[in-house]
Amino acid sequence: MSGHSKWSTIKHKKGAADAKRGKVFTKIIKEIMVAARMGGGAIDANPRLRAAVLAAKAENMPKENIERAIKKGTGELEGVAYEEMNYEGYGPGGVAVLVDIMTDNRNRAASDIRHIFSRNGGNLGEAGCVAWMFSKKGSIVFNKDKVSEDELMEIALDAGADDVKDEDDQFEVITSLEEFVNVRAAFDARELAYEVAEITMVPQTTVRVEDEKLAQQLLRLMDGLEDSDDVQNAYANFDIPDEILDRIA
């Protein structure tokens, strides 16, 4: 399969663990603060903020935490001023890696990301070296054993989805940024349970990784990036076969 949707499912399951819940909350709070700072605190008038609040609710974040983060973003409450950056590079096997950073210390973030890449067989590249390989899309992932393909296709296409991909044990619904909220709402209205629903960077091409040791090193790189306090999201264009991914993830 394409790898990124499978990795998203694995990543979200890991993020649901109690040990990492605090880190997940922290990343969402930072996104809410920045979204409110950039586009205002009115959820209905700020698509980025609306998406961040929906993500917070999906993680069962308390309402007061969400409201406090919005107020910190708009300046009603004192809060940290985060800076957004992107890093690009290559992982083991020539896999393209794109990293979204949100930090209050640019130098610390740069040093940390460089160290994570080098420690796990990767290297940072110049700005623009891999970003062109990805497109920002909505992604909604379903387990095949929990949905009817016919019903899924009908809802997705009627709601304005771009594509439905059949990937081994999963279906992945791809949407434009503009239609993501509408498509997800259509699935919610019909009570179709999805594994992941997110705005992500979808790779236009993928790199097949069939060597298990190389795949392990690649996932260690991705885990290291996701665990960094300054990293909001990390994307890669790997294509690891399910049988290998299930063994090592």
From Swiss-Prot:
One of the GO biological process terms: regulation of DNA-templated transcription
MF terms (GO), sorted A to Z: DNA binding
Keywords noted in UniProt: Cytoplasm, DNA-binding, Transcription, Transcription regulation
Location, primary (coarse class): cytoplasm
Signal peptide (from-to): none
InterPro entries assigned to the protein according to its UniProt record, in alphabetical order: Integrase-like_N (IPR017856), TACO1_YebC-like_2nd/3rd_dom (IPR048300), TACO1_YebC_N (IPR049083), Transcrip_reg_TACO1-like (IPR002876), Transcrip_reg_TACO1-like_dom3 (IPR026564), YebC-like (IPR029072)
Disulphide linkage map: none
GO CC terms of this entry: cytosol
Pfam families reported for this sequence: TACO1_YebC_N, Transcrip_reg
Record SUPFAM superfamilies: YebC-like (SSF75625)
Location in or out of the cell: Cytoplasm
HAMAP family per the UniProt record, alphabetical: Transcrip_reg_TACO1
Family: Belongs to the TACO1 family.
NCBIfam families according to UniProt: PRK00110.1 (NF001030), PRK12378.1 (NF009044), YebC/PmpR family DNA-binding transcriptional regulator (TIGR01033)
Protein known as: Probable transcriptional regulatory protein Sfum_0996
The species this protein was found in: Syntrophobacter fumaroxidans (strain DSM 10017 / MPOB)
